[in-house]
Regions:
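Helix-loop "lid/cap" segments that line or gate small-molecule binding pockets
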Residues: 1
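C-terminal cap/substrate-recognition subdomain and adjoining C-terminal extension
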Residues: 6-153
């Protein structure tokens, strides 16, 4: 991100979301989000991917909350560094804990869907962990733990 001006990055991001991400947003994924919305659940995406890339994805799903790795900015330009704690592995748990504390909420009746073995620290803390479109290693671990394994095509 640091090598290009903001206008170029935003243009590329728009094209990326339109051509690569939008086709991956399946009716099944949208229906799952809508089920949680209808239940009155707090909707949150938590991802290791940076917020510059993931904010439009959260917006496309109508998910109002996003915890993502934050790219450092200086005078409107990305520096190539990370600001704060990256939301990766245990950092994801740390960032979520801070977010929950700030909102006076907790993980009671929480649901978390992941396709990554890197999310085991968070999967093991929520009430309802789900492995989604998981690779063989995560799927095997999820089955061993008794967690549901979903394929959302």
């Amino acid at each position: 991100l640091a090598e290009h001006d903001r206008a170029t990055l935003e243009r590329w991001r728009t094209q990326f979301v339109r051509t690569k991400i939008a086709p991956l947003i399946t009716p099944a994924a949208q229906a799952l989000v809508e089920q949680h919305r209808a239940r009155g659940d707090t909707l949150l995406i938590i991802t290791a991917t940076n917020s510059f890339i993931t904010a439009p994805i959260a917006e496309a799903f109508g998910i109002p909350h996003l915890i993502a790795t934050e790219p450092e900015e200086l005078n409107g330009q990305f520096t190539g560094k990370v600001a704060g704690v990256p939301s990766y592995r245990e950092g994801k748990v740390e960032r979520l804990s801070e977010w929950l504390t700030d909102r006076h909420e907790n993980l009671d009746d929480s649901w978390f869907y992941s396709d990554s073995l890197n999310d085991l620290p968070l999967l093991s803390r929520v009430s309802q962990p789900f492995a989604v479109n998981a690779d063989a290693v995560l799927a095997a671990h999820a089955r061993h733990m008794g967690w549901p394994v979903l394929q959302i095509g």
